[in-house]
Each structure stands twice: as structure tokens, then as C-alpha cells.
């Protein structure tokens, strides 16, 4: 699947979709977990993958809620790195 098709798939899911923001230069998604421990565990897994990809999210955590924004600052837009990390995050979230 090409980059455009993958981006469309990420933002067009009927439930819990990623939202394009700031002129389609950022992806945003909010996640909720049973408690803080599950949220933190999720963030830890994402952090390990982000380090492997050398691509780090902008995120916040309040108790059981994690908000994630993805963008590539060097290009001031979305790149393959953002799509790879978003797809990993979605897969990980399904397991939680």
C-alpha cells in the first residue's frame, strides 16, 4: 500500500481514527486505558519503538488518558516515519 493509501486508512477508520491537524501536517489520536499503569505501560512500549525508529511523538498523559501527536519536524509535515509509528501504535493499542 502506498503512503497516501496508508494515510487515508489511518484517518478514515470509523472508530478511534487518527485526526489530521494543522493543514494535514500532523496526526493526532487520543487513547484511554483502564488505569494509569496500563497507560504508562503503553507509553513505555511506544517509547521503545520510537527510539528504534529514531522518531519521537509529542504526547501527554493524564491518569488513564494518552494524547499523541505525530509529525516530522524536519519536513514540517507527515512522512513514512509518522505512518510507521502510527501503525505500530494502533497495533499496540488493540492488544491493550
From Swiss-Prot:
Pfam families: Pterin_4a. Signal peptide: none annotated. Its EC number is 4.2.1.96. One of its GO terms (cellular component) is cytosol. It is an enzyme of class 4 (lyase). The keyword Repeat does not apply. One of its GO terms (biological process) is tetrahydrobiopterin biosynthetic process. It is found in: Spore wall. Its main location: other. Keywords: Lyase. The keyword Lyase applies. NCBIfam families: PRK00823.1-3. Has a role in spore wall formation. Belongs to the pterin-4-alpha-carbinolamine dehydratase family. This is Pterin-4-alpha-carbinolamine dehydratase. It comes from Schizosaccharomyces pombe (strain 972 / ATCC 24843) (Fission yeast). The lineage of its organism: Eukaryota, Fungi, Dikarya, Ascomycota, Taphrinomycotina.
